[in-house]
């Protein structure tokens, strides 16, 4: 059985992320979406909200589960008995950064990283940009899964 980890903060998860999860799920027997937290950073959504949003957005992926973690991604990967990381790439800038991380992860832990080119329709989408546009009153419904869009609107209107 082969398994891979899709790590990130996912604050919130976007349709670009879901696209990467779908493609990873098609290639690996098991996929773990790892929400890695940084205690020094305060996100818009707490950990439980992020887990719920990803679970609600990926019900169609039976070989995917969501877990939380801290520390090095490679430690998370190895502790689950997996040997691969899957990362989506939007731009050349993403590639430059992720390539260095991939090489370090291979060096320190023997963990391989597989890059997935983001679908062109999501190449400009980021969690930060979606939040910023939504905060300014813009429509981000084509950038976020419906459960996420709903929760974001509720949070911004003070109902969450």
Curated annotation (Swiss-Prot):
Span of the signal peptide: none
Pfam hit, one: CTP_transf_like
EC code(s) of this entry: 2.7.7.3
Obligatory cofactor(s): Mg(2+)
Gene Ontology CC annotation, any one: cytoplasm
Cell location: Cytoplasm
InterPro entries the record matches: Cyt_trans-like, PPAT, Rossmann-like_a/b/a_fold
This protein's pathway: Cofactor biosynthesis; coenzyme A biosynthesis; CoA from (R)-pantothenate: step 4/5
Reaction equations catalysed: (R)-4'-phosphopantetheine + ATP + H(+) = 3'-dephospho-CoA + diphosphate
Keyword terms: ATP-binding, Coenzyme A biosynthesis, Cytoplasm, Magnesium, Nucleotide-binding, Nucleotidyltransferase, Transferase
Binding site for substrate: 9, 41, 73, 87
Family according to the record: Belongs to the bacterial CoaD family.
Name of the molecule in the record: Phosphopantetheine adenylyltransferase
């Amino acid at each position: 059985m082969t398994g891979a980890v899709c790590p990130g903060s996912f604050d919130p998860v976007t349709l670009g992320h879901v696209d990467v999860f779908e493609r990873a799920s098609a290639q690996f027997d098991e996929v773990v979406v790892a929400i890695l937290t940084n205690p020094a950073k305060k996100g818009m959504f707490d950990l439980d909200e992020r887990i719920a949003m990803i679970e609600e957005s990926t019900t169609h992926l039976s070989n995917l589960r969501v877990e939380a973690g801290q520390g090095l991604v490679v430690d998370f990967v190895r502790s689950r008995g997996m040997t691969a990381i899957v990362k989506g790439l939007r731009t050349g800038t993403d590639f430059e950064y992720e390539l260095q991380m991939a090489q370090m992860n291979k060096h320190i832990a023997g963990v391989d990283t597989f890059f997935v080119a983001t679908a062109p329709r999501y190449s400009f989408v980021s969690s930060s940009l979606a939040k910023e546009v939504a905060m300014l009153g813009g429509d981000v419904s084509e950038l976020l899964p419906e459960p996420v869009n709903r929760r974001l609107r509720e949070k911004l209107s003070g109902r969450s």
